[in-house]
């Protein structure tokens, strides 16, 4: 699973997700991408499940870039614990995404294969997404 090697603070507040993504909203590396359409959290396990689904479909055909990283700790209190007594221990890591963020990029495969691989990856994610392709300009 993806997670930071070292963090300054073990626990974080939940925070708010307002506005659209203004960074990471354009294709940078590949020719095809998966863009998220709504705000939310994507866990390290969901990112890994999406990556595995895509790589299994395209086999050794193309290259995949993961454009998000889970850097926010989510805490959890043990089961059947009374309220109070402080914040729970860090349980897993999530990536905070806002609408417009490119999650994955891909190159070296056909449009149909890329679209199918991204569709398989999107099924593993909790948010609505859309397939995007690079516009090939002739100037």
Swiss-Prot record:
GO terms for cellular component: cytosolic large ribosomal subunit. Keywords: Ribonucleoprotein, Ribosomal protein, RNA-binding, rRNA-binding, tRNA-binding. One of its GO terms (biological process) is translation. InterPro entries: Ribosomal_uL16, Ribosomal_uL16_bact-type, Ribosomal_uL16_CS, Ribosomal_uL16_dom, Ribosomal_uL16_sf. GO terms for molecular function: rRNA binding; structural constituent of ribosome; tRNA binding. CDD domains: Ribosomal_L16_L10e. Binds 23S rRNA and is also seen to make contacts with the A and possibly P site tRNAs. Part of the 50S ribosomal subunit. This is Large ribosomal subunit protein uL16. It comes from Koribacter versatilis (strain Ellin345).
């Amino acid at each position: 699973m993806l997670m930071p090697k070292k963090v300054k603070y073990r626990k974080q507040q939940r925070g708010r997700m307002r506005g659209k993504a203004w960074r990471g909203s354009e294709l940078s590396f590949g020719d095809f991408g998966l863009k998220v359409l709504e705000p939310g959290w994507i866990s390290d396990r969901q990112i890994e499940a999406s990556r595995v689904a895509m790589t299994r479909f395209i086999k050794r055909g193309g290259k995949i870039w993961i454009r998000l990283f889970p850097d926010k700790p989510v805490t959890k209190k043990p089961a059947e614990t009374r309220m109070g007594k402080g914040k729970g221990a860090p349980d897993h890591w999530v990536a905070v995404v806002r609408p417009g963020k490119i999650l994955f990029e891909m190159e070296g495969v056909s449009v149909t294969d890329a679209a199918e691989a991204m569709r398989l990856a999107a099924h593993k994610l909790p948010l609505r997404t859309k397939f995007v392709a690079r516009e090939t300009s002739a100037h």
